[in-house]
Regions:
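Glycine-rich FAD cofactor-binding loop and adjacent beta-loop-alpha segment at the N-terminus
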Residues: 3-4, 8-72
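C-terminal helical "tail/cap" subdomain of flavin- and related membrane-associated enzymes
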Residues: 294-370
Length: 370
Protein backbone atom coordinates (compact mmCIF):
# COMPACT_ATOMS: atom_id res chain seq x y z
CA UNK A 1 0.00 0.00 0.00
CA UNK A 2 1.32 3.46 -0.91
CA UNK A 3 0.97 5.99 1.90
CA UNK A 4 1.82 9.69 2.04
CA UNK A 5 2.41 11.37 5.40
CA UNK A 6 2.39 15.16 5.60
CA UNK A 7 4.52 16.36 8.52
CA UNK A 8 7.47 14.59 10.11
CA UNK A 9 7.31 15.85 13.67
CA UNK A 10 7.16 13.33 16.49
CA UNK A 11 3.73 12.02 15.48
CA UNK A 12 4.24 11.97 11.71
CA UNK A 13 7.68 10.38 12.00
CA UNK A 14 6.46 7.68 14.38
CA UNK A 15 3.55 7.01 12.00
CA UNK A 16 6.03 6.60 9.13
CA UNK A 17 8.00 4.01 11.11
CA UNK A 18 4.87 2.20 12.23
CA UNK A 19 3.31 2.00 8.76
CA UNK A 20 6.62 1.07 7.14
CA UNK A 21 6.93 -1.83 9.57
CA UNK A 22 3.35 -2.81 8.64
CA UNK A 23 4.57 -3.28 5.05
CA UNK A 24 3.55 0.05 3.51
CA UNK A 25 5.62 2.20 1.18
CA UNK A 26 5.74 5.61 2.83
CA UNK A 27 6.54 9.01 1.36
CA UNK A 28 7.17 11.43 4.22
CA UNK A 29 6.58 15.06 3.23
CA UNK A 30 8.24 17.75 5.38
CA UNK A 31 9.38 21.25 4.40
CA UNK A 32 11.56 21.69 7.51
CA UNK A 33 15.11 20.35 7.71
CA UNK A 34 16.04 17.71 10.28
CA UNK A 35 17.93 20.38 12.22
CA UNK A 36 14.81 22.56 12.42
CA UNK A 37 12.73 19.58 13.53
CA UNK A 38 15.19 18.75 16.30
CA UNK A 39 15.78 22.27 17.63
CA UNK A 40 12.57 22.76 19.59
CA UNK A 41 12.67 23.45 23.31
CA UNK A 42 9.83 21.26 24.54
CA UNK A 43 9.52 18.68 27.29
CA UNK A 44 7.12 15.74 27.39
CA UNK A 45 5.85 13.29 29.97
CA UNK A 46 6.01 9.76 28.55
CA UNK A 47 3.57 7.19 29.93
CA UNK A 48 3.62 3.40 29.75
CA UNK A 49 1.21 3.47 26.80
CA UNK A 50 3.90 5.27 24.77
CA UNK A 51 6.59 2.98 26.15
CA UNK A 52 4.66 -0.06 24.86
CA UNK A 53 4.29 1.52 21.41
CA UNK A 54 8.00 2.35 21.22
CA UNK A 55 8.92 -1.15 22.39
CA UNK A 56 6.73 -2.70 19.71
CA UNK A 57 8.49 -0.64 17.05
CA UNK A 58 11.97 -1.44 18.40
CA UNK A 59 12.79 2.14 19.37
CA UNK A 60 12.50 2.00 23.15
CA UNK A 61 15.85 0.41 24.05
CA UNK A 62 17.82 3.15 22.32
CA UNK A 63 15.52 6.04 23.23
CA UNK A 64 15.12 5.17 26.92
CA UNK A 65 18.76 6.07 27.60
CA UNK A 66 17.86 9.74 27.17
CA UNK A 67 14.72 9.66 29.32
CA UNK A 68 14.49 10.65 32.99
CA UNK A 69 12.30 8.24 34.99
CA UNK A 70 10.27 9.39 37.98
CA UNK A 71 8.98 7.11 40.73
CA UNK A 72 6.75 9.64 42.49
CA UNK A 73 4.06 11.86 41.02
CA UNK A 74 2.93 14.32 43.69
CA UNK A 75 -0.50 15.86 43.13
CA UNK A 76 -1.09 18.95 45.28
CA UNK A 77 -4.16 21.17 45.64
CA UNK A 78 -2.96 24.53 46.98
CA UNK A 79 -6.45 25.76 47.79
CA UNK A 80 -7.08 22.74 50.02
CA UNK A 81 -3.49 22.39 51.20
CA UNK A 82 -3.84 18.67 50.45
CA UNK A 83 -1.62 16.18 48.65
CA UNK A 84 -1.53 12.59 47.45
CA UNK A 85 1.14 10.64 45.58
CA UNK A 86 1.04 8.20 42.67
CA UNK A 87 3.66 5.47 43.17
CA UNK A 88 4.96 2.67 40.97
CA UNK A 89 2.86 0.31 43.11
CA UNK A 90 -0.23 2.02 41.67
CA UNK A 91 0.68 0.79 38.18
CA UNK A 92 -0.57 -2.50 36.71
CA UNK A 93 1.75 -5.34 37.78
CA UNK A 94 3.38 -5.81 34.31
CA UNK A 95 4.40 -2.12 34.29
CA UNK A 96 5.87 -2.10 37.80
CA UNK A 97 9.06 -3.87 36.68
CA UNK A 98 10.11 -0.68 34.86
CA UNK A 99 10.39 1.12 38.23
CA UNK A 100 8.88 4.33 36.89
CA UNK A 101 5.48 5.98 37.03
CA UNK A 102 6.57 7.66 33.80
CA UNK A 103 9.48 9.36 32.07
CA UNK A 104 10.38 12.92 31.16
CA UNK A 105 11.82 13.49 27.71
CA UNK A 106 13.31 16.50 26.00
CA UNK A 107 12.14 16.97 22.43
CA UNK A 108 15.57 16.99 20.82
CA UNK A 109 16.52 13.56 22.18
CA UNK A 110 13.31 11.86 21.05
CA UNK A 111 13.39 13.51 17.64
CA UNK A 112 17.02 12.56 17.04
CA UNK A 113 16.36 8.91 17.94
CA UNK A 114 13.30 8.69 15.70
CA UNK A 115 15.00 10.41 12.74
CA UNK A 116 17.97 8.08 13.11
CA UNK A 117 15.62 5.10 13.10
CA UNK A 118 13.88 6.37 9.95
CA UNK A 119 17.19 6.66 8.10
CA UNK A 120 17.62 2.87 8.38
CA UNK A 121 14.23 1.98 6.87
CA UNK A 122 14.32 1.50 3.11
CA UNK A 123 10.58 1.85 2.52
CA UNK A 124 10.42 5.42 3.90
CA UNK A 125 11.19 8.12 1.35
CA UNK A 126 11.67 11.62 2.77
CA UNK A 127 10.55 14.45 0.46
CA UNK A 128 11.54 18.05 1.39
CA UNK A 129 8.20 19.75 0.76
CA UNK A 130 4.79 19.81 2.40
CA UNK A 131 2.90 19.77 -0.92
CA UNK A 132 1.95 16.46 -2.55
CA UNK A 133 2.21 16.91 -6.35
CA UNK A 134 -0.20 14.09 -7.20
CA UNK A 135 -2.49 12.67 -4.51
CA UNK A 136 -3.69 9.97 -6.91
CA UNK A 137 -0.38 8.16 -6.39
CA UNK A 138 -1.42 7.20 -2.86
CA UNK A 139 -3.98 4.83 -1.42
CA UNK A 140 -4.25 6.91 1.77
CA UNK A 141 -2.81 10.21 2.98
CA UNK A 142 -1.99 10.88 6.64
CA UNK A 143 -2.05 14.52 7.75
CA UNK A 144 0.22 15.05 10.75
CA UNK A 145 1.17 18.67 10.13
CA UNK A 146 0.11 19.99 13.52
CA UNK A 147 -2.62 22.11 15.03
CA UNK A 148 -2.20 24.81 12.33
CA UNK A 149 -2.50 22.17 9.61
CA UNK A 150 -2.63 23.58 6.08
CA UNK A 151 -4.06 20.25 4.95
CA UNK A 152 -7.02 20.62 7.28
CA UNK A 153 -7.58 24.21 6.16
CA UNK A 154 -7.47 23.22 2.50
CA UNK A 155 -10.01 20.44 3.05
CA UNK A 156 -12.15 22.77 5.22
CA UNK A 157 -12.52 20.15 7.93
CA UNK A 158 -14.83 21.42 10.70
CA UNK A 159 -13.68 21.38 14.31
CA UNK A 160 -14.63 22.62 17.76
CA UNK A 161 -12.11 25.22 18.87
CA UNK A 162 -11.67 27.74 21.66
CA UNK A 163 -8.84 29.63 23.34
CA UNK A 164 -8.24 29.37 27.07
CA UNK A 165 -7.91 32.72 28.84
CA UNK A 166 -4.47 31.48 29.85
CA UNK A 167 -0.93 31.27 28.61
CA UNK A 168 1.74 28.71 29.41
CA UNK A 169 5.17 29.70 30.72
CA UNK A 170 7.98 27.18 30.77
CA UNK A 171 11.55 27.40 32.08
CA UNK A 172 14.44 25.11 32.97
CA UNK A 173 15.48 25.75 36.56
CA UNK A 174 17.95 24.33 39.07
CA UNK A 175 16.01 23.49 42.24
CA UNK A 176 16.96 22.66 45.82
CA UNK A 177 14.95 20.56 48.26
CA UNK A 178 13.48 18.13 45.74
CA UNK A 179 14.38 14.56 44.74
CA UNK A 180 15.58 13.92 41.20
CA UNK A 181 13.04 11.09 40.77
CA UNK A 182 9.84 12.94 41.61
CA UNK A 183 7.45 15.07 39.57
CA UNK A 184 4.70 17.44 40.66
CA UNK A 185 1.28 18.31 39.26
CA UNK A 186 -0.03 21.27 41.22
CA UNK A 187 -3.54 22.71 41.16
CA UNK A 188 -4.21 26.30 42.16
CA UNK A 189 -6.55 29.14 41.31
CA UNK A 190 -4.18 30.64 38.72
CA UNK A 191 -4.15 27.37 36.80
CA UNK A 192 -2.35 24.04 37.04
CA UNK A 193 1.41 23.82 36.80
CA UNK A 194 3.96 21.02 36.69
CA UNK A 195 7.51 20.46 37.92
CA UNK A 196 9.27 17.79 35.84
CA UNK A 197 12.71 16.23 36.53
CA UNK A 198 15.38 16.49 33.83
CA UNK A 199 18.19 14.80 35.76
CA UNK A 200 20.11 15.86 38.85
CA UNK A 201 18.94 19.23 40.17
CA UNK A 202 17.57 20.36 36.80
CA UNK A 203 13.79 20.62 36.41
CA UNK A 204 11.33 21.94 33.87
CA UNK A 205 8.69 24.20 35.38
CA UNK A 206 5.52 24.53 33.29
CA UNK A 207 2.85 26.88 34.63
CA UNK A 208 -0.42 28.07 33.15
CA UNK A 209 -1.86 31.38 34.28
CA UNK A 210 -3.95 34.29 33.08
CA UNK A 211 -2.68 36.11 30.01
CA UNK A 212 -2.39 39.36 31.98
CA UNK A 213 -0.31 37.83 34.77
CA UNK A 214 1.69 35.67 32.38
CA UNK A 215 2.63 38.66 30.23
CA UNK A 216 3.76 40.51 33.36
CA UNK A 217 5.87 37.55 34.55
CA UNK A 218 7.48 37.11 31.13
CA UNK A 219 8.81 40.67 31.37
CA UNK A 220 10.46 40.11 34.75
CA UNK A 221 14.23 39.97 35.08
CA UNK A 222 15.73 36.55 35.82
CA UNK A 223 16.18 37.37 39.50
CA UNK A 224 12.60 38.59 39.86
CA UNK A 225 11.30 35.57 37.94
CA UNK A 226 13.15 33.34 40.42
CA UNK A 227 11.49 35.26 43.24
CA UNK A 228 8.13 34.61 41.59
CA UNK A 229 8.86 30.88 41.27
CA UNK A 230 9.74 30.73 44.96
CA UNK A 231 6.18 31.88 45.75
CA UNK A 232 4.47 29.14 43.72
CA UNK A 233 6.73 26.11 44.23
CA UNK A 234 5.78 23.59 46.95
CA UNK A 235 7.00 24.28 50.48
CA UNK A 236 10.66 23.34 50.94
CA UNK A 237 11.58 23.60 47.25
CA UNK A 238 13.72 26.59 46.35
CA UNK A 239 14.72 27.82 42.88
CA UNK A 240 18.44 28.35 42.49
CA UNK A 241 19.24 29.30 38.89
CA UNK A 242 17.34 29.72 35.62
CA UNK A 243 19.17 27.84 32.87
CA UNK A 244 17.30 29.20 29.85
CA UNK A 245 15.19 32.30 29.42
CA UNK A 246 11.52 31.47 30.10
CA UNK A 247 9.34 30.85 27.05
CA UNK A 248 5.60 31.26 26.65
CA UNK A 249 2.87 30.12 24.30
CA UNK A 250 -0.92 30.47 24.13
CA UNK A 251 -3.17 27.59 25.19
CA UNK A 252 -6.08 26.53 23.06
CA UNK A 253 -8.38 23.56 22.56
CA UNK A 254 -9.26 21.99 19.24
CA UNK A 255 -11.17 18.82 18.40
CA UNK A 256 -12.13 17.76 14.89
CA UNK A 257 -15.68 16.50 14.47
CA UNK A 258 -14.23 13.70 12.31
CA UNK A 259 -10.66 12.39 12.16
CA UNK A 260 -10.73 11.87 8.41
CA UNK A 261 -11.82 13.49 5.14
CA UNK A 262 -12.09 11.14 2.18
CA UNK A 263 -8.79 9.30 1.99
CA UNK A 264 -7.10 11.80 4.32
CA UNK A 265 -6.54 10.66 7.93
CA UNK A 266 -5.88 13.22 10.67
CA UNK A 267 -3.26 12.24 13.22
CA UNK A 268 -2.11 13.86 16.46
CA UNK A 269 -2.58 17.60 16.91
CA UNK A 270 -4.02 17.85 13.42
CA UNK A 271 -7.05 16.06 14.91
CA UNK A 272 -6.98 17.27 18.52
CA UNK A 273 -5.15 19.71 20.74
CA UNK A 274 -5.68 19.82 24.50
CA UNK A 275 -4.48 21.74 27.56
CA UNK A 276 -0.97 20.63 28.62
CA UNK A 277 -2.13 19.77 32.17
CA UNK A 278 -1.33 16.16 33.02
CA UNK A 279 1.11 15.77 30.11
CA UNK A 280 -1.39 13.81 28.01
CA UNK A 281 -0.77 15.46 24.62
CA UNK A 282 2.05 13.42 23.06
CA UNK A 283 0.83 10.13 24.53
CA UNK A 284 -2.61 10.73 23.03
CA UNK A 285 -1.01 11.48 19.64
CA UNK A 286 1.06 8.31 19.73
CA UNK A 287 -1.99 6.23 20.60
CA UNK A 288 -3.44 7.58 17.33
CA UNK A 289 -0.40 6.13 15.57
CA UNK A 290 -0.78 2.77 17.30
CA UNK A 291 -4.48 2.55 16.45
CA UNK A 292 -3.80 3.32 12.78
CA UNK A 293 -0.98 0.79 12.45
CA UNK A 294 -3.14 -1.88 14.10
CA UNK A 295 -5.80 -1.31 11.44
CA UNK A 296 -3.21 -1.70 8.69
CA UNK A 297 -2.28 -5.11 10.09
CA UNK A 298 -5.83 -6.46 9.64
CA UNK A 299 -5.87 -8.55 6.41
CA UNK A 300 -9.49 -7.66 5.57
CA UNK A 301 -8.71 -3.93 5.68
CA UNK A 302 -5.57 -4.27 3.57
CA UNK A 303 -7.82 -5.28 0.69
CA UNK A 304 -10.44 -2.66 1.59
CA UNK A 305 -8.23 0.26 2.55
CA UNK A 306 -10.98 2.81 1.80
CA UNK A 307 -12.65 1.69 5.06
CA UNK A 308 -9.60 2.50 7.20
CA UNK A 309 -10.21 6.28 7.62
CA UNK A 310 -13.76 5.81 8.91
CA UNK A 311 -12.87 2.91 11.22
CA UNK A 312 -9.86 4.83 12.54
CA UNK A 313 -12.03 7.88 13.28
CA UNK A 314 -14.57 5.80 15.18
CA UNK A 315 -11.88 3.82 17.03
CA UNK A 316 -10.11 6.91 18.33
CA UNK A 317 -13.17 8.97 19.25
CA UNK A 318 -13.76 7.58 22.77
CA UNK A 319 -10.16 7.90 23.98
CA UNK A 320 -9.63 11.36 22.47
CA UNK A 321 -12.98 12.75 23.62
CA UNK A 322 -12.60 11.33 27.14
CA UNK A 323 -9.06 12.65 27.64
CA UNK A 324 -10.09 16.03 26.18
CA UNK A 325 -12.99 16.34 28.62
CA UNK A 326 -10.88 15.06 31.53
CA UNK A 327 -8.05 17.57 31.00
CA UNK A 328 -10.44 20.46 30.44
CA UNK A 329 -12.36 19.52 33.60
CA UNK A 330 -9.11 19.38 35.56
CA UNK A 331 -8.25 22.93 34.46
CA UNK A 332 -11.67 24.22 35.47
CA UNK A 333 -11.52 22.25 38.75
CA UNK A 334 -8.13 23.78 39.52
CA UNK A 335 -9.29 27.34 38.91
CA UNK A 336 -12.61 27.11 40.74
CA UNK A 337 -12.37 28.98 44.03
CA UNK A 338 -16.11 29.04 44.74
CA UNK A 339 -16.78 27.81 48.27
CA UNK A 340 -19.49 25.40 47.11
CA UNK A 341 -16.79 23.30 45.40
CA UNK A 342 -14.63 23.06 48.50
CA UNK A 343 -16.31 19.97 49.96
CA UNK A 344 -16.30 17.94 46.69
CA UNK A 345 -12.63 18.81 46.15
CA UNK A 346 -11.81 17.82 49.72
CA UNK A 347 -13.61 14.49 49.30
CA UNK A 348 -11.83 13.76 46.00
CA UNK A 349 -8.41 14.29 47.59
CA UNK A 350 -9.33 12.40 50.75
CA UNK A 351 -10.51 9.36 48.78
CA UNK A 352 -7.53 9.37 46.40
CA UNK A 353 -5.09 9.65 49.28
CA UNK A 354 -6.65 6.73 51.13
CA UNK A 355 -7.87 4.45 48.34
CA UNK A 356 -5.14 2.59 46.48
CA UNK A 357 -7.82 1.04 44.25
CA UNK A 358 -9.00 4.43 43.01
CA UNK A 359 -5.42 5.67 42.56
CA UNK A 360 -4.69 2.60 40.43
CA UNK A 361 -7.79 3.28 38.33
CA UNK A 362 -6.99 6.98 37.81
CA UNK A 363 -3.33 6.30 37.03
CA UNK A 364 -4.34 3.62 34.54
CA UNK A 365 -6.56 6.16 32.74
CA UNK A 366 -3.72 8.70 32.72
CA UNK A 367 -1.31 6.05 31.47
CA UNK A 368 -3.30 4.05 28.93
CA UNK A 369 -6.29 6.22 28.09
CA UNK A 370 -9.81 4.94 27.58
Amino acid sequence: MNIAIIGSGLTGSLAAISLAKAGCRVDLYERLSDEELVNRDRTYAITHSSRKILEKLGIWSNLSKDLVPFQYLNVIDYELNKKFVFLTNDLPIPDQKYSAVGWIAEHKFIMLSILSFISNLENINKIPTSVIPNTNNYDLIVAADGSSSNTKKKLKTPSFHFKYDQMCITAKVLLRGVKSNEAFEILNSEGPFAVLPLGGDLFQVICSQSILKGTYNMNLSKSLFLDYLSTILPYGIEPDTIIDAPESFPIDFCLNYLFFSGKYIYLGETAHKIHPVGGQGLNLCWRDVDCLSNLFSIPLLKNNHSLIPLIYSISRSIDVLSISILTDSLVRYSRSNISIFYLPRFLVFFILKNSSLLRKYILNLMTNGF
